[in-house]
Amino acid sequence: MNRIFLQFGSGLGPMSRSLPIALALAEARYEIKYLGYDMAKTHMKKAGIEELCSDFGISDIKKGSPNPQWSTADEFWSMIGYGNMPWVERKVDELISLLKEFSPDYILSDLGILACIASRIMGIPLIAINQSCYHPNVKLKWWEDNYKFENYKSEDSLLYKLNAYLKKKGAPQLNTFTEIFTGNLTIIPSFYDFDPIQDVKKYNTHYVGPVLYIPKETASERVLKLF
């Protein structure tokens, strides 16, 4: 039986995209374990998806100084607490220990940055559910003036800090911060015309539209042929 580890970010969006995929994989007899936020636990338990570890949490994360003028993903993720690298390194090391015990064949992440980092270090194939705004090849109009800073490598940038940690672990370096949210397969749950990306071939990126779960017994033959 193939095993999959799932981590998703906070808010309803990542969970609402991840849960249908987890349900379909469970139906296909994959063993799935997840890590998510407290608000998601009731829904995941109801769906029969087991936690990787009930004691693993990120409630002790300390947010950085708020900056309403942030203009890059690097700045935003630093601001919400991931710029604190001693904390990030500790949590990733904890996660790696748990993953060694579970031994997943794949990691599935919807903006679960700790899982993305662990995948890069452990060499476990990553299926990344991403938003176009966190894809390295997107260029949003209101970020255009500061877009070059996405590659900013000062010692204060999260890109620099992550690369220092990845180098220490013998893992591949990042070219941009948002590259951490791409995988062996990168899925955009949207439409190209609505969220265009400059080069979809890079990072093996695929637009799939809204992610929904249809029980196998009620799915049409046309839908089943997709799989």
Predicted regions and their residues:
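Active-site-proximal region of nucleotide-activated glycan assembly enzymes
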Residues: P125-N204
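Nucleotide-sugar donor-binding and catalytic loop/hinge architecture
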Residues: M1-N2, K202, I214-F227
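Short, well-ordered beta-to-alpha junction loops that form the rim of enzyme active sites
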Residues: D110-I113, F191-Y192
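Active-site regions of enzymes building and remodeling cell-envelope glycoconjugates
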Residues: A47-G57, I124-L126, K201-L212
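Glycosyltransferase specificity loop/lid
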Residues: M1-L108, C116-A118, C133-P136
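Solvent-exposed alpha-helices and their adjacent loops that cap or buttress functional pockets
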Residues: K100, T178-F181, F227
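Short beta-strand->alpha-helix junction loop in the catalytic core
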Residues: F191, V208-E217
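Alpha-helix C-terminal capping segments
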Residues: I117-P125
